[in-house]
UniProtKB/Swiss-Prot annotation:
Residues 12-23 have a biased composition (Basic and acidic residues). Residues 51-70 have a biased composition (Acidic residues). Residues 1-117, 153-172, 210-266 are annotated as: Disordered. This is Uncharacterized protein F10E9.3. InterPro entries: F10E9.3-like. Residues 100-112, 153-167, 241-265 have a biased composition (Low complexity).
Length: 362
């Protein structure tokens, strides 16, 4: 037990001695740094043996170009930092003052920019690698403080985040010109829609409702199907035949030829008088005909004739005076065409028959 306590005490003494030596070394180190605060020694260029002598002065020109490049890079870095510091300031007054005032250049900022922003390092520091870096005595650059987004959006020359606000166009393009008096009165009554840009007078959309189509109450009346509408102007009103003026069908007891005119003298169309003006039409079926050329027998021709008679009778019973008038006019026209030119008659009759069968016209 005694040996263990002796060993522990000896180890504790050794640790204390080591700590004292470390503290003494730390106190000596800053003293040496204070002694070495002086400028680095200037190294003179050794005289060459004649092998690398600049006979034409090329070395001097290269040194001058390097110095010019260093000065140019310094000025560029200064302008960039000044622009950034102006943009991220918080007060509007300081921003305006800095924009209006010329940029200030000082030797301290040039030195710091040259060391921190890629400027050229002196040759003495490059050659003497063992030398410690000299602490800069210039004050540090002021830290940039970011302004809030609201402040940046309200600052002049910057675009706001909200594109829908009307102040965006004013800041971007300036104040729009005043609206003429002639347009002010129209704009009060008609819907106004803004133009594509914030400049220029507003476009006035004309109301698409036609004023001359409105009633006294301001409503658009419904027009009947018999009224022709041509570009907003009321067209021809077709006359309607009242049901009292229409004569009864031929199957009801009175024929078209013997019936008297029941139309009034008010200009209403009289179908019976028009039927009397037409030449009489004989609806008959010829038995026989060209059955031999077509290869049909007499029995087939008789069946076809009976079917035609039935269809003609059905049409006559179901038709009115209007249908009879239209049919008689068509048949009379075909007869005149046949007497004039048979080729035209065959072409027209075939086209007419195809239309009748296509649209199922009775």
């Amino acid at each position: 037990m005694a040996s263990k306590t002796r060993r522990g005490s000896s180890l504790a003494k050794k640790e204390k001695e080591i700590k004292k030596e470390i503290e003494e070394d730390k106190e000596v180190a800053p003293i040496q740094e204070e002694d070495d605060d002086g400028p680095p020694p200037i190294l003179e260029r050794e005289a060459s043996c004649g092998e690398n002598d600049d006979t034409d002065g090329d070395g001097k020109e290269e040194d001058a170009q390097k110095e010019d490049d260093i000065d140019g890079s310094k000025t560029k870095n200064e302008s960039i930092l000044e622009a950034l510091s102006q943009f991220f300031t918080a007060d509007d007054a300081t921003v305006k003052n800095r924009r209006n005032s010329p940029p200030s250049e000082s030797s301290s900022t040039r030195n710091t920019l040259g060391l921190n922003r890629g400027g050229a390092i002196p040759k003495a520091l490059l050659l003497n690698k063992n030398l410690r870096p000299v602490p800069s005595k210039t004050p540090p650059i002021a830290t940039t403080r970011f302004a809030s987004l609201r402040h940046l959006s309200s600052a002049p020359g910057t675009s706001a985040s909200t594109s829908g606000s009307p102040s965006v166009g004013i800041r971007k393009y300036g104040v729009p010109p005043p609206m003429p008096r002639s347009l002010r009165n129209i704009a009060g009554s008609i819907n106004v829609v803004g133009s594509n840009s914030s400049l220029g007078p507003a476009r006035l959309l004309e109301s698409r409702k036609r004023h001359f189509d409105k009633d006294k109450d301001g409503k658009n009346p419904k027009r009947s199907s018999l009224v022709a509408y041509n570009g907003g102007r009321a067209g021809e009103n077709f006359r309607k035949v009242p049901p009292s003026a229409v004569s009864p069908a031929p199957g009801s007891g009175s024929s078209a030829s013997s019936g008297t005119s029941t139309s009034s003298s008010n200009g209403i169309i009289d179908v019976q008088s028009m039927l009397r003006d037409q030449s009489p039409v004989r609806m008959q079926v010829m038995v026989g005909g060209d059955h031999e050329t077509n290869g049909d027998s007499i029995q087939e021709a008789m069946e076809l004739a009976n079917a035609q008679k039935e269809s003609i009778g059905n049409i006559a019973r179901a038709s009115s005076h209007h249908n009879m008038l239209l049919g008689s006019m068509i048949i009379n026209g075909l007869n005149t065409l046949q007497s004039r030119d048979k080729d035209e008659y065959t072409n027209f009759s075939s086209d007419l028959f195809s239309l009748i069968t296509r649209y199922n016209i009775n």
